[in-house]
Amino acid sequence: MSQHRQKRVMLPLLLAALVLLLAAFFLWNRPSRLNRILYQEGYTITGCTEQSLSVAIPKKLLPDGFPQEAEAFEASDDLGLLLWSDGSSNLYLDALCYANGRTPDLLWASFHFQYEPSSRGSLLLPYLPDGQGGSTQSLGLSSTEAEVDCSPWPDAVHMAGQGPDEIFSVYLDAAAFQAASESFTFQVDDLWEVSYQPT
């Protein structure tokens, strides 16, 4: 094959490769659909409704003997423990361990929301978006009571912190958690169901 002919064949191949690389670059750096919804880039937020969510931690998801025999239980990114889902919003338990290293009467639990937004619908957010990418964090607990195997347990859960973004954490009474044979349930308030549609 002559050199001139090789150049004619290579030039379109190089251009095609360049186009593919540029397309991959722009797709990779494109903001996620969640961010586009929150910034109202191609989407309009049509409503925000305050909601509450009952969070249940099934004991069968945890390792045997936890928390009595375990130092800590942490879910890695590939082992997130899904606690709740409505199809587009998912709540995961990320970590559950003794508070402050080894306080035997208090547990610390960390959760995060993860989203799979469709082209239109609603999401359950732990903050109120302002439509320009900012938000007001307002997550709270209206009651410190937990439900331990369908029985109320007073003063068993307290808010530990919120943020960044879709993360929040709570303190749990270790005795109440250990008393649960099936599940430990508490209610999180001041969540926001945000409805959106394409513009």
Where are these regions (language model features)?
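Conserved functional micro-motifs across diverse proteins
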Residues: 8-199
